[in-house]
Regions:
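A late C-terminal transmembrane helix in Major Facilitator Superfamily
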Residues: 134-169
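Structural signature of the two symmetry-related core transmembrane helices
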Residues: 84-99
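Extracytoplasmic gate region of multi-pass secondary transporters
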Residues: 11-75, 158
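Paired small-residue
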Residues: 107-115
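Multi-pass alpha-helical transporter architecture, strongest
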Residues: 180-215
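Intracellular juxtamembrane helix-capping segments at the cytosolic ends
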Residues: 122-135
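Helix-to-loop junctions at the C-terminal end of transmembrane segments
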Residues: 70-81, 166-167
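A membrane-interface helix-boundary motif in multi-pass transporters
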Residues: 164-181
């Protein structure tokens, strides 16, 4: 879906809804991803009572499932709708974290590790591939770089918000709940990240030039 023959410039890409929907969806995913990277061992030791060694072992399984998801996601992205894959991954990120936070069992920890790791891996390849499909390759670097500025805001906000709320409430439940719901809501961004229509910058500047010439 949405493979473009035309190559967008950075300014043309930024004027499309697709650029913003992908960037916001990608950022919403990192609310959970960045928080888990920094806070999962702390959550497991402080809220769930695990030893530091066991918490580190559990956290270490996340990259394993991410690897499996990445391998699978690269294949599926060539066969199926990339937006659909990314959207499903968003639901997996959020629902897995909610399950772990609200159901205090070993099983839900395992469910989270599997769902989150697979979702991270499945979604990751689609982020660059969607941008390449939609905007072409000639300005891919600047487009990706500008997207990264937006994504980084989410990546920083996630762990800071979760940590702040944990200090205020005494546990990570509220913070992780908010981040989970934010990531699940990010599913909507990928629903609306439909292929863009290219409007050349020259076409936008043309009316202004025409008005000046007519004076």
């Amino acid at each position: 879906e949405g493979v473009q023959d035309a190559h967008f410039t950075t300014s043309e890409a930024v004027r499309t809804h697709s650029f913003w929907m992908i960037a916001l969806g990608h950022g919403a995913a990192l609310l959970v991803v960045s928080s888990v990277l920094t806070l999962l061992p702390l959550y497991l030791t402080e809220d769930r009572g695990f030893s530091a060694g066991r918490a580190a072992l559990i956290a270490g399984f996340v990259p394993l499932f991410q690897f499996i998801g990445t391998f699978t996601g690269g294949y599926l992205g060539d066969k199926f709708n990339k937006r659909l894959i990314a959207g499903v991954a968003m639901l997996m990120h959020g629902s897995g974290l909610l399950a772990m936070v609200y159901f205090d069992t070993w099983i839900t920890i395992g469910v989270f590790v599997v769902l989150h790791g697979l979702a991270w891996g499945l979604r990751g390849p689609q982020m660059a591939a969607l941008r390449a499909d939609y905007f072409g390759s000639s300005s891919f670097g600047p487009i990706m770089g500008l997207s990264s500025l937006i994504i980084t805001c989410f990546a920083v906000t996630g762990p800071v918000l979760a940590g702040y709320l944990a200090d205020r409430t005494g546990d990570f439940k509220l913070g992780f709940t908010i981040l989970s719901l934010g990531t699940i809501a990010g599913f909507i961004f990928f629903v609306f990240a439909t292929p863009p229509k290219r409007i050349p910058a020259s076409a936008i500047a043309a009316p202004a030039s025409a008005n000046i010439d007519g004076l």
